[in-house]
């Protein structure tokens, strides 16, 4: 277990960067290394989100609905992302009459950066993480929950009834599903015995079943598939994708909390949505799929990690294309009467199993 932890954890990225800088390991060198590390990780996530996310969304949706999708601009239609960016950023930023301007301006920033900051403690590969605090899992859920504040701000500050309804729906939905999400994560903590993200990954490094030619790793998706399925459903509800896109619901409340946003602010909200989807995929990969663990040397762990995130993302897009939207009352009832009860049952069952094993 110790060797696995050393292989998967490594030194945080800023510590490695400090060794390459001429400033030494003093306050200046540490600060510069932290900024460079954050820029590298942030750029990786923003690139995957801004370019690959929307393009893959269109392609996957087209495949499920027997259409061609984007195929005109550039190879495989990749240049459409640049065209979309130019189109959106060149539009006029229209401020709705009667808007609470400070809150209205701040909401898109909160939505985007609350997700981006969550990647700081995710171990993406050998040494590819900004920090590794002992309460890393608590940090991820705490920082991601700030998005609820951004949704309320966007809905309230827009001075629009549809925006306000979208914000209220978002809060009701997050309250109904963040509690089950956390309870399911606690069951993983009981198995791993730690809230530290790198140790949760390392705890899954041992083989669960050795069949000689092939060994099944002790990923918690195999150890506790019930919790894995529950977490995927709760995460789908948390990020607000079909069939749980109640805060937007175009056929009911126009575009929900983002109705009055345009230009660069709409881009930030759009990026924030994709960042939260990818952050959810990163958390699922870390808690249930062994993080960056996979066949081959530890140096290609980042490749396996991104592949697992994309697997979760493709499932999200499949759900968006295949499943109809639920009503708000159905969604809340499933959250409080279904997911909460099942997550509590999973937690009790996990505690009993861990107690017997111990």
Model-derived regions, located:
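Selective transmembrane helix interface/packing segments
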Residues: 2-358
């Amino acid at each position: 277990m110790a060797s696995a932890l050393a292989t998967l954890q490594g030194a945080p990225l800023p510590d490695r960067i400090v060794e390459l800088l001429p400033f030494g390991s003093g306050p200046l060198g540490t600060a510069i290394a932290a900024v460079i590390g954050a820029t590298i990780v942030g750029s990786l996530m923003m690139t995957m989100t801004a370019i690959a996310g929307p393009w893959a969304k269109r392609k996957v949706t087209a495949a499920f609905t027997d259409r061609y999708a984007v195929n005109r601009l550039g190879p495989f239609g990749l240049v459409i992302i640049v065209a979309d960016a130019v189109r959106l950023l060149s539009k006029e930023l229209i401020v709705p009459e009667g808007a609470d301007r400070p809150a209205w301006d701040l909401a898109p920033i909160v939505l985007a950066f609350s997700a981006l900051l969550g990647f700081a403690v995710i171990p993406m590969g050998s040494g590819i993480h900004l920090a590794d605090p002992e309460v890393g899992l608590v940090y991820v859920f705490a920082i991601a929950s700030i998005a609820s504040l951004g949704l309320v701000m966007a809905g309230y500050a827009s001075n629009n009834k549809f925006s306000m309804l979208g914000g209220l729906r978002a809060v009701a939905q997050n309250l109904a599903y963040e509690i089950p999400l956390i309870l399911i994560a606690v069951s993983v903590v009981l198995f791993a015995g730690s809230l530290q993200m790198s140790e949760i990954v390392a705890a899954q490094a041992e083989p669960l079943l050795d069949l000689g030619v092939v060994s099944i790793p002790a990923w918690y998706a195999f150890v506790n598939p019930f919790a894995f399925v529950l977490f995927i459903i709760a995460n789908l509800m948390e990020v607000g994708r079909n069939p749980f896109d109640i805060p937007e619901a175009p056929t009911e409340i126009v575009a929900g909390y983002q109705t009055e946003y345009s230009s660069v602010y709409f881009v930030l909200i759009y990026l924030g949505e994709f960042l939260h989807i990818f952050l959810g995929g990163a958390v699922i990969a870390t808690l249930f799929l062994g993080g960056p663990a996979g066949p081959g040397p530890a140096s290609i762990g980042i490749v396996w990690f991104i592949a697992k995130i994309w697997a979760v993302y493709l499932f999200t897009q499949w759900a968006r294309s295949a499943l109809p939207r639920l009503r708000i009352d159905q969604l809340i009832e499933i959250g409080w009467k279904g997911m909460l009860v099942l997550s509590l049952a999973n937690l009790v069952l996990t505690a009993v199993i861990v107690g017997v094993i111990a």
